[in-house]
Amino acid sequence: MLAAGRRVACAVSGGVDSAVAALLLRRRGYQVTGVFMKNWDPLDEQGACSVDRDCEDAYRVCQKLDIPFHQVSYVKEYWNEVFSDLLKEYELGRTPNPDIVCNKHIKFNHFLHYAMDNLGADAIATGHYARTSLEDEEVFQQKHTKRPRELFRNRFEVRNTVKLLQGADLFKDQTFFLSQISQDALRKTIFPLGDLTKSFVRKIASEHGLHHVLKKKEACTTFPFQSMGVCFIGERNFEKFLLEYLEPQPGNFVSIEDKKVMGTHKGWFLYTIGQRARLAGLQGAWFVVDKDVSTGDIFVAPSTDHPALFRDLLRTNRVHWIAEEPPAELVRDKMMECHFRFRHQMALVPCVLTLNQDGSVWVTLVKPARALTPGQFAVFYKGDECLGSGKILRLGPSVFTMQQGRNREEGTKKEDIDKVEPAT
């Protein structure tokens, strides 16, 4: 059997998905090594999240499967390449997505090279619900380049692009979180769960006695306004956690409709667009629709579907394309139709991309989307292929702003008509 000599380093987190991924690889005959990545030091703060408990669960999985277990620390790398970036983004008034950044820098860079260079692995594997255009055996035929890489890849080297494809379980599909990983990493990665549903994965775990991981929650915690799965926050209040690292920046809640001050807040970085703003003494729900970092004002509106929450235009930074280059259609025509999302599990939205000279894109949506948020990633799709992503840096005017402009324009026209002297 070809698989017998193939060595695979499988990331194990102590959860059910990575456990079943390792199990399936073992059943296929690969020489599997489980690797637990420690990305956060609980001694750094007064946290409630137990990294040690996750490590113990991962170790028990490897014992159960009779595979070697390794633990590697990326605490320093995570701080420098993920968490520091997260803090800077919040200071700029944006809402970052550390999961995407972590996958790019830690799991599919540092872990990949550790597995290849230190463990002698031929490939890595994770428990993500995603697929690639390579068959598993083709992964082992891909060349691995040891670090440091050459500054420029040999342009005469002929390589067929490996595609990142959505998982069979579209509800659990995690290509969104993989949209910034490199082509080189994708070539050396196996996703054993790509063709499976979550319910079937849990069934496999149960049938093979992995009961301790079945009892665990999906993630240690999530942010209050969207699922990010930042495990090191634990059961703590997100506001208190962030204020451990950022100085309070008090400001006002301001009504987007009449610019009236509605209350005060401790810092614009504690709120994201679309989040409910709890305003003392006011009836009804108010929602964050915009932020002005220069003044510290957070603009709010009195309903969850207020037109100030909806926009149909955004601009990204330089897009990371999974194929390393923009799609040929986009290069040729400078425009391309595709689909996009900026939150995991949100419905894909038809859009048109316009390519800029700096590699960024304007994204024009066929209909306005709610709570487009600077700092989040716009992830692009063609069919079941994830093309890549770019960080949202700028937003077009909201539907509310456009309505106000039209109202002013119509009012001006009416005034002009009134000024015209009647014909005699």
Swiss-Prot record:
GO terms for biological process: tRNA wobble position uridine thiolation. GO terms for molecular function: ATP binding; tRNA binding; tRNA-5-taurinomethyluridine 2-sulfurtransferase. Its main location: mitochondrion. Coiled coil: none annotated. Residues 406-424 have a biased composition (Basic and acidic residues). Catalyzes the 2-thiolation of uridine at the wobble position (U34) of mitochondrial tRNA(Lys), tRNA(Glu) and tRNA(Gln). Required for the formation of 5-taurinomethyl-2-thiouridine (tm5s2U) of mitochondrial tRNA(Lys), tRNA(Glu), and tRNA(Gln) at the wobble position. ATP is required to activate the C2 atom of the wobble base. HAMAP family: tRNA_thiouridyl_MnmA. The record marks 128, 276, 376 as: Interaction with tRNA. Disulfide bonds join 102-231. During the reaction, ATP is used to activate the C2 atom of U34 by adenylation. After this, the persulfide sulfur on the catalytic cysteine is transferred to the C2 atom of the wobble base (U34) of mitochondrial tRNA(Lys), tRNA(Glu) and tRNA(Gln). The reaction probably involves hydrogen sulfide that is generated from the persulfide intermediate and that acts as a nucleophile towards the activated C2 atom on U34. Subsequently, a transient disulfide bond is formed between the two active site cysteine residues. It comes from Gallus gallus (Chicken). Residues 97-99 are annotated as: Interaction with target base in tRNA. It is found in: Mitochondrion. It holds the Pfam family tRNA_Me_trans_C. Residues 403-424 are annotated as: Disordered. Keywords: ATP-binding, Disulfide bond, Mitochondrion, Nucleotide-binding, RNA-binding, Transferase, tRNA processing, tRNA-binding. Gene3D superfamilies: Adenine nucleotide alpha hydrolases-like domains (2.30.30.280), HUPs (3.40.50.620), Translation factors (2.40.30.10). One of its GO terms (cellular component) is mitochondrion. This is Mitochondrial tRNA-specific 2-thiouridylase 1. The keyword tRNA processing applies. Residues 172-174, 343-344 are annotated as: Interaction with tRNA. Belongs to the MnmA/TRMU family.
